[in-house]
């Protein structure tokens, strides 16, 4: 936050100003006139407007602005909090589900009452790792703790106005594994010759393909470096894809509109709240069209993710209900609290046993996108070897897949943290055309656009464009170091055991060394999921190979698409757009009429 702004200066209302692009005109109030003269004439410039309600700026408005980003987002992010979760649980009773041999279903009277809701939640593995490190338990036990809190009889269901809880708690690793397969497919298509591609070049990202799962990185790119947008992977993040999956399947199977399915996501960073507010991630993007209009119950878009809270906010949610997380049973829920998913095929896909293959140290703490791409291409090139080269710091790593003959087959990289991201962006930035008289104009720039890349799906002249894929995350150290994770000072307060955290007896501010040690503890808990999964797999089927995982994902997603009668591209892909700023433009400058009309026509704000 800049030196001019501080948290003390902010309140729950931000008045439209010169640095805000929301098209709200501020007019003087209409003052009542005591004049009784029926012949009084008022000139046009003296006509006073009607008194209008106060202007409101929503989070989606501020996401469309590169002016007062920090202050506005800091205020409006707080609208998605533990308080919203409690208010929603108290405002709506839980929709009763009746179980039979075909799975759960709703009675016709219950489905039409309009008041009840189906509550579902999704949890990221980084959240479980943070809880495991805080309470000195395993990652699997942290899973049980969350399930008991959200769905069990001693958790949220034990209190509140209606005793509502969450019918299903989903692991985002399921959709992450699916996205890993689709990411490898996407990168593979970009490396093919244009004539051999199965996907249109207009829907493919340019090389190098940049990961798009981190909302902090996406927001930064859209606002400050729009020239990298063609490089972004078109795939949704695990959070967004989980939301689309749950809203589509549950609304279809249970016969309720998507607005009756309330989806809570528990994530490691605050930027996930921004992602959930994107208009591209609502039912408008996937609803079937009726004469060009989405088939929704109202004109208001329904988010795929209704609310996002962080790991720390999960602790606050528990304390607000007077629930002590460490006292909850660390065991799986009784069958009466775990209804089957409405569709048997998708139930097997969504709640399968995890093999933990992408939570290894080699894959990293951010989902293993780069690791899976490399392993997929290595499997297609027997005898090849992955060579690693460290960068200036631990958050920059470059990889080369070398053939048995020592020739490079593909290159990839990992860039974590904004300091390193800025270096990556500089490498991708197209060369500017010289303005000097008589300067030679490159053929690719002769059309007049000085930032126009040489071609749509080929590498440009930057030194970083020889990569096929780059995993980009905003947080140094990856997603286990997200801004919403439990800090060491919070863990000291939350822990009930002196063995849980280092230096519990020392209440002073943690040193950098202690903070690094704490992050290493969280990373260790994150990686322990692999050993937990291996223990579950003992005596059972072996972990799936890469071709088996690919076939499983493609089969499940084809079934999902056919079930919903919606093209798969509308379910799994999203779009990005450049965010322009009006800051510094003169008031009499020409107005981008199209953009203003688009913004003005969206009640409650939008992208």
From Swiss-Prot:
A Gene Ontology biological process in which this protein takes part is:
iron-sulfur cluster assembly
Q: Where is the composition biased (Polar residues)?
A: 29-40, 452-461, 494-505
Q: Which terms are listed as keywords in the entry?
A: 4Fe-4S, Iron, Iron-sulfur, Metal-binding
Q: Write out the residues that bind [4Fe-4S] cluster 1.
A: 20, 62, 65, 68
Among InterPro entries, the record links this protein to: Cytosolic_Fe-S_CAF (IPR050340), Fe_hydrogenase (IPR009016), Fe_hydrogenase_lsu_C (IPR004108)
Q: Where is this region: Disordered?
A: 28-47, 439-461, 494-513
Binding-site list for [4Fe-4S] cluster 2: 214, 269, 475, 479
Which terms does the record give in the GO molecular function aspect?
Answer: 4 iron, 4 sulfur cluster binding; iron-sulfur cluster binding; metal ion binding
Please give the Pfam families that the UniProt record associates with this protein: Fe_hyd_lg_C
Record bears the keyword Metal-binding: yes
Say what the protein does: Component of the cytosolic Fe/S protein assembly machinery. Required for maturation of extramitochondrial Fe/S proteins. May play a role in the transfer of pre-assembled Fe/S clusters to target apoproteins.
The family annotation for this protein states:
Belongs to the NARF family.
Protein name per Swiss-Prot or TrEMBL:
Cytosolic Fe-S cluster assembly factor nar1
